[in-house]
Amino acid sequence: KGEIVGIAGVSGNGQSELIRCITGLEKVDGGKVTIDKKDITNKTVMNIREAGIAHIPEDRYMWGSAPEATLAENALMGFEVSKRGILNIQKVTSHAKELISKFLVKADSPSQKIKELSGGNAQKLIVAREMAMETPLIIACEPTRGIDIGAIEFIHDQLVAKRNSGDSVLLVSSELSEIMDLSDRIYVIYDGEIVGEFKRGSIDEKALGLLMVGGKNNEK
């Protein structure tokens, strides 16, 4: 707890499959997935979220949001907002406004479709929604891919704040600088296997990049 653990790897080496297994999007064939000693192996996505894992998916439009839906509708994904099957519109709108304001999402209104936002603002809404769950663990997969520098810095600050609050972040990224700057511990994945584990400052960017493409680490 209270740390950012980075998983560094080039796309296609198994990190996406690993996260899908942890978050319930793909079945686990062997081994176990646990959080706080609780077995969540092959549980449903909702069961896993309820167990304390929030998830920022690598594809913000395929997995992280419903592009045709409004900001308000996207902001409520994963939250209890209905009573006896009746949607509380006031609660939905209020929740969305709070997230938009707190995470500096540039939008016209909660009724705007998320697909109409810039990539950075759409991503900030997704991050806001997952952070609002206040889970002990958040998994962030390629959280800053394809967005502007301002949004990158803002999201990085949110992940660090999450760590500083005593919670944990599992950061999956192919961006070397992101992994190096944010992670307290780093695992390198290559061809579906963990090929290295390092503490902050114990490996440089060149050596890390070499491991990510199947090379050897010659650092002492």
Please report, for each region that a protein language model flagged, where it lies by residue.
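Glycine-rich phosphate-binding loops of nucleotide-dependent enzymes
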Residues: 1-220
